[in-house]
Regions:
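Non-catalytic, solvent-exposed segments at the cell envelope interface
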Residues: 1-200
């Protein structure tokens, strides 16, 4: 959008923050964004530790990757990861691909949700108070608390699903201006999103 030329989607936040990111998602995918949250690596580690860590099923390659960078002795299988270990897991790309990395990131978020939803209302409010300083957002504190209060009654029964964009058969690989990129089939992606999400 605006003065910017075609580029990787993940460049939009660096170029223009939340405003450009939201405009780009809306223009390309027809999705209206209600609010944004951003956490840096330091904040990510701190939030994970505040939640109490997360349970993640690791492959042998993932366990070896975490061990190499954290001087730990984790083995394949179900592991309880602290903030530093969870960050290493979420950032891992060289053991497979970008698609593998984004899948790990989704697993981290879902596991964190599973961990947090078992907290009491008092514990959740205390957690929110402690982690807000690590979050950059265009939502007000009152909007965040309002969303939290709306979520609390549903937390024990709500089911969260994730969806990857671009989906299979909705892109092709190319080299553009020296960048290795996935070129999206935007009409097909919009169609898939309309089938998956209740878009307005």
């Amino acid at each position: 959008p605006g003065k910017y030329s075609d580029n990787r989607l993940n460049a939009t936040y660096a170029f223009g923050g939340f405003e450009l990111l939201d405009a780009t998602l809306t223009e390309n995918f027809g999705i209206s964004i209600d609010g944004n949250l951003e956490v840096d690596f330091t904040g990510f580690e701190a939030i994970m530790d505040r939640v109490g860590g997360i349970d993640i099923e690791l492959t042998s390659a993932e366990a070896a990757y975490i061990n190499k960078r954290n001087h730990t002795s984790i083995v394949a299988g179900l592991n309880h990861l602290n903030g530093a270990e969870a960050l290493t897991y979420a950032r891992a790309r060289k053991i497979d691909s970008d698609f593998g990395r984004t899948e790990r990131q989704r697993k981290v978020l879902l596991s964190m949700y599973e961990q947090a939803k078992n907290l009491s209302v008092t514990e959740l409010l205390g957690l929110m108070y402690n982690i807000l300083s690590y979050i950059t957002t265009d939502l007000t504190d009152s909007e965040i608390l309002s969303l939290l209060y709306r979520l609390l009654p549903l937390a024990s029964s709500i089911s969260i699903n994730s969806y990857t964009v671009p989906a299979d058969d909705c892109y092709y690989y190319a080299s553009i201006r020296g960048m290795s990129v996935l070129v999206p089939d935007l009409p097909r992606i919009r169609q898939c999103l309309e089938e998956y999400l209740p878009l307005e």
